Amino acid sequence: MASALEQFVNSVRQLSSQGQMTQLCELINKSGELLAKNLSHLDTVLGALDVQEHSLGVLAVLFVKFSMPSIPDFETLFSQVQLFISTCNGEHIRYATDTFAGLCHQLTNALVERKQPLRGICVIRQAIDKMQMNANQLTSIHGDLCQLSLLAKCFKPALAYLDVDMMDICKENGAYDAKPFLCYYYYGGMIYTGLKNFERAMYFYEQAITTPAMAVSHIMLEAYKKYILVSLILHGKVQQLPKYTSQVVGRFIKPLSNAYHELAQVYSTNNPAELRNLVSKHNETFTRDNNMGLVKQCLSSLYKKNIQRLTKTFLTLSLQDMASRVQLSGAQEAEKYVLYMIEDGEIFASINQKDGMVCFHDSPEKYNNPAMLHNIDQEMLRCIDLDDRLKAMDQEITVNPQFVQKSMGSQEDDSGSKPSSYS
C-alpha cells in the first residue's frame, strides 16, 4: 500500500480504538480524493480493517468503490456491501448516516439499473434497522426499500416499515432533503394501492401532496393523479385536501391533471357510458401515466356504487333488471359483481339461483360483540397514545431555543406596534 493509504488505515484504527468518532468522520470526509486515486489498492485497505471495529473506515472505502464511473466486478462489490451492512457497528454508523445512506442509494440504483431489485430488499431492510433510532423514525433509505419492493413486485417486506406511523426524521447530518420523503410516501401509496388497501394508500398520497413546497415536484404531481383515482374508488368522489396544502398544488399541479379532473366530474354523474367515453378520450394520457389499471378500477367502482344505490330503493330485484339499471352487459355480469360485493362486505344480499332474484338484507353488525368492543378499545388506546405524543412534541417545541427567540421577537414587534394610550 502507498504510504498515504497506510496512514489512513492507521488513523482509522487509532481513532476507532479511542472512540473519537467525530474526528474519524472528519477524516473519512477528507479522504475521499485519496481513496479515489488508489482504487486498485482499496481491497487491500478493506482487508486491513475490521468491519465491526472500524465500520466508518470500511464505509468510506465502499462508498468510494461504488462511486466509480464503471464497476469492474459488481458481484464482489455487492458481496462486500452486503457483508458490511449485516455486520457493521450500528452505533458507529450513526455518526455518518449521510455517507451510509449514500452507499445504500448507490446500491439501490445499481440494482435497479441491472433489473435485480429483489436482491437488495433484505440488504436495505438491514440497513434501515442499523440506521434507525426507533421504529417510528423515517430515513432516506425507506424510499429505496419501497422502490425495490415495487419493482420486484414483492410488497410484504416493505409493509413492516409502512404500517408504522412515522413520528421523526433522521437528519443524516443535514443531508436529508424532500425527495426521499416524497419517494417513501409515493412508493408506499403505490404498494398499498397494489394491495387494494385504498384507505392507507390515500393517506400516503396525501402526505406526498401536502409536503411544503415552493416549486412543482413531479413526484407530487403523480401522487396527486393517483390520489384522485383512489379517492373515487374509495369514496365515490374526490376528497378535499387539507387547508395547509401548498399553493403550488392549486396553482400548478391541478392544471397539469385536467384529464383526471374531467374523470372525477363525469364519475359524479353516475353514468358508466359517459365515463367509458371519457376513458377512451384520454386513453393515451392514462396509459402514459401508467394509471390505466386504476382508471379501470374506477369504472368498476362506479358499477358497484350504482348497485349499492339500488339497495336503498329495492328489497328484491332480478339480475337482468339490475344489469339494465346499472348498464352492465347482462345478468351474468351483474351476478359476478353482486357475488364480489357480498364477499368484500360491500353489500348484504343473497341470490336465488332458481328465479335469478337478488334479495338485499340489512347489515348483520349490531356493534355488541366482543370483537367490536376490542376494536373500540384499541382505537381508544391509539387516541391516548397520539395525545401523549402531541403533548411531548408541543413541549419539545416550547423549549426549542429558535422557537423561543422567534416568539419573543414577535411579541416585541406586537408591543412596539401598539399605539400608546397616553398623550
Curated annotation (Swiss-Prot):
InterPro entries: COP9_N, CSN3, CSN3_C, PCI_dom, WH_DNA-bd_sf. Pfam families: COP9_hel_rpt, CSN3-like_C, PCI. Its main location: cytoplasm. Gene3D superfamilies: 1.25.40.570. GO terms for biological process: ubiquitin-dependent protein catabolic process. One of its GO terms (cellular component) is cytoplasm. It comes from the Eukaryota. Keywords: Cytoplasm, Nucleus, Signalosome. Residues 197-365 form the PCI domain. Disulfide bonds: none annotated. Residues 401-410 have a biased composition (Polar residues). Residues 401-423 are annotated as: Disordered. PROSITE patterns: PCI (PS50250). It is found in: Cytoplasm; Nucleus. Belongs to the CSN3 family. Component of the CSN complex, probably composed of cops1, cops2, cops3, cops4, cops5, cops6, cops7, cops8 and cops9. Component of the COP9 signalosome complex (CSN), a complex involved in various cellular and developmental processes. The CSN complex is an essential regulator of the ubiquitin (Ubl) conjugation pathway by mediating the deneddylation of the cullin subunits of E3 ligase complexes, leading to modify the Ubl ligase activity. This is COP9 signalosome complex subunit 3.
